[in-house]
């Protein structure tokens, strides 16, 4: 007897990925940072795609953003591609923003795989599994064409590639993705003050302390009115602020 499907909550982000390949090494880290940013995320953690495929499609339709994480083994899963088809349909209707993410796979390889007439489209790490999957489903030409259309469409979008030389660690890669998701959801990417604002606040507090508090409670109040005091405290405040800015939301790369 089929279990009853409850109406899902509205998700902000749906993550489409090859579970047993990426869950532990990348996706868990990405999910953590999204949730730390206050973003509601849906991930199919049970890895029983066949049981509730329609349910997953519903979750996609309830979402505002979908992250399509392409990896070397992505095309070993027909369920990943079926989800991608639904994501593409929602994207064409302007009901969903899809962001392609290329994790340890070349973006041009993924794009070539989606073009059945393209030269050299069958020799890549992504292309070969896709070729095999299409052969296994040769009796379902409409389904295969849907996969190819979805791949062509989604990979034309501006996304993120782990192979970009700017990313030394997964942490930097993840933080850029989270920043883009927040931008698409109209969530302020930085709630901190600017350096000018912090400096102004530090000067204001400094003046209040030096001319109103120190004279009442400290014997050597003249020191707190010297340039050394003002410059020193301002430098400490700004250094602390910059340290915080560089380290906020950073977690160590997953092992």
Curated annotation (Swiss-Prot):
GO terms for cellular component: endoplasmic reticulum; nuclear envelope; nuclear membrane. This is TIR domain-containing protein. PROSITE patterns: TIR (PS50104). It catalyses: NAD(+) + H2O = ADP-D-ribose + nicotinamide + H(+). It is an enzyme of class 3 (hydrolase). Could play a role in nuclear morphology, specifically nuclear size. GO terms for biological process: signal transduction. Disulfide bonds: none annotated. Keywords: Hydrolase, Membrane, NAD, Nucleus, Transmembrane, Transmembrane helix. Its main location: nucleus. Residues 201-255 form the KASH domain. It is a multi-pass membrane protein. GO terms for molecular function: NAD+ nucleosidase activity, cyclic ADP-ribose generating. SMART domains: TIR. It is found in: Nucleus membrane. The keyword Hydrolase applies. Forms homomers. Interacts with SUN1, SUN2, SUN3, SUN4 and SUN5. Disruption phenotype: Shorter roots. Its EC number is 3.2.2.6. It comes from Arabidopsis thaliana (Mouse-ear cress). The gene is TIK.
